[in-house]
Design a protein with these regions (language model features):
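N-terminal loops that bind phosphate or other acidic moieties
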Residues: 1-9, 13-174
């Protein structure tokens, strides 16, 4: 293998909403995080319910095409291929749960896979991240507190105040 561990991060606008739609369409009861301190869960649920009406097949590829975003199948494909020859960390939260759910339908090596995220996701009382991951696949979750509450930079400190919480692989890079 060219690497001991491939770390895959993501950052996509609206990603928690498309992730929620994919998770629900694939049969997982998910409550997802938000990049905002006040999670607009009701709005997300309305959008997802509307999107789910477009689904006309239970085939995973059709589901992702109808309600997902391009990141989900792209990263799931990377996971499927790379986990056969290397360790892979999905560095992220809600969106990586959707990647894992899709990958569980197309195949990947669970033994070489881990989720790495921030404690801002795993400690969020409004979501079921840890339970959700356990229902999707038998992969470990690594959760880290990046200590951003002590940052002198307001943009970084905002993560600890409920903004963003994860993104661009933050949990996996710490």
């Amino acid at each position: 293998s060219l690497t001991d561990c491939l770390i895959i991060g993501e950052s996509i606008p609206g990603g928690t909403t498309t992730a929620l739609a994919v998770l629900r369409a694939l049969g997982f009861d998910a409550q997802v995080s938000s990049s905002m301190p006040e999670n607009p869960a009701e709005l997300k649920n309305e959008i997802v319910e509307s999107a789910l009406k477009r689904i006309d097949s239970d085939h995973p590829y059709s589901i992702v095409a109808k309600v997902g975003d391009p990141m989900i199948p792209f990263v799931a494909g990377m996971l499927s291929a790379a986990s056969g020859v290397s360790n892979v960390m999905l560095a992220g939260g809600t969106q990586m749960a959707a990647v894992l759910a899709f990958a569980s339908k197309i195949g990947f090596n669970e033994e070489n896979t881990v989720i790495g995220t921030t404690s801002y996701i795993t400690n969020d009382q409004n979501v079921n991240f840890k339970d959700l991951i356990q229902k999707i696949a038998n992969v470990p979750i690594i959760s880290i507190d990046p200590g951003l509450k002590n940052s002198q930079y307001s943009g970084l400190k905002a993560f600890s105040e409920g903004f963003a919480k994860e993104g661009a692989g933050a949990g996996g890079t710490t």
